[in-house]
Amino acid sequence: MPLLDSVPGATFKTRVRDESVPGSNPFRWQERTSDEIFKGRKVVLFALPGAFTPTCSSNHLPRYEELHAELVAHGVDQIICLSVNDAFVMFQWGKHLGAKNIFMLPDGNGDFTRKMGMLVEKSNLGFGLRSWRYSMLVNDGNIEKMFVEPGLSDDADGDPFEVSDADTMLAYIKGVQPKGVSSPRRQFEG
């Protein structure tokens, strides 16, 4: 299982709201580095294969949103959802799911995901390069705990969802045994 001691350096291309931008779409590009995102903070990051996909949309992201307050109450400063998608897709997906408390982090070129050892080929599904599903607790840039779904490989037949879920992460932070993945939080259509 790939495991680093600290998060790798990467630059993320994000879009931020800026009322000084004229027009009906007041957003501008802003680069964010790994250091800006992780240094001096306790962060839960969960990574998934793609926005608008079944498990990601019905359970993975919605459950982290649902448990946001409890994770924060246990010392987490920020929860991040990362996917090898662009900033526009991540914004619209978060908006579609009503994710108000999760930072939607686009890794459009897969640079961070590649350095994490989690970039996989999913051409068998027409996805191209994507992130393998995992979650991690990062404290001041150092990876304290990482939950990687089994079977990490290119063109995997399945999409396991057993350990990177919000309930497992919360159980780890609380120091208790996880009870397993919760049932889907929303219906997936498509």
PLM segments and residue spans:
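Chalcogenol-based redox active-site neighborhoods
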Residues: 1-190
